[in-house]
Amino acid sequence: MSTEQTFIAVKPDAVQRGLIGYIISKFELKGYKLRALKFLVPSRDLVEEHYAEHKGKPFYEKLVGFMASGPVCAMIWEGKQAVKTGRLMLGASNPLDSAPGTIRGDYGIDLGRNVCHGSDSIESANREIKLWFQPSEIQVYDRTIEPWIYE
């Protein structure tokens, strides 16, 4: 079975609103395996490196300040097409453009407070995972439920 990993972060707005459990539940119920989780207030340096591709854009400084303003729940999820499906589960970056049933569609209203981050490519996922987690923090384990999820 071929799987991949994606990086998902519950942003400070969603942490304050008590949405961590809901977001974790969505990924678990989909059948994805949680490989790592940490709860932290990220440093400004970490957030700047994470969003380096957006440096110089009008929203960059506000985004960095927001992401470093409070606790974030950073996670690694694994499964078939985890990056693509994870993004579909989150919904469009602008919550007002997100379909009902998606995380942002159900719980987001404003682009600047869009509840969560999800890797947009396998390459981004690999970079973000290395940025946020040490290899020793990533758990390797078998789930007995796997045959009930994958052929």
From Swiss-Prot:
Name of the protein described by the UniProt record: Nucleoside diphosphate kinase
Active site (record annotation): 117
Subunit structure: Homotrimer.
Cofactor(s) this protein cannot do without: Mg(2+)
Protein family: Belongs to the NDK family.
Name of the top EC class for this enzyme: transferase
Domain of life: Eukaryota
Designated gene of the protein: ndk1
Organism: Schizosaccharomyces pombe (strain 972 / ATCC 24843) (Fission yeast)
EC number: 2.7.4.6
Residues binding ATP, per UniProt: 11, 59, 87, 104, 114
Chemical reaction(s) catalysed: a 2'-deoxyribonucleoside 5'-diphosphate + ATP = a 2'-deoxyribonucleoside 5'-triphosphate + ADP; a ribonucleoside 5'-diphosphate + ATP = a ribonucleoside 5'-triphosphate + ADP
Known function: Major role in the synthesis of nucleoside triphosphates other than ATP. The ATP gamma phosphate is transferred to the NDP beta phosphate via a ping-pong mechanism, using a phosphorylated active-site intermediate.
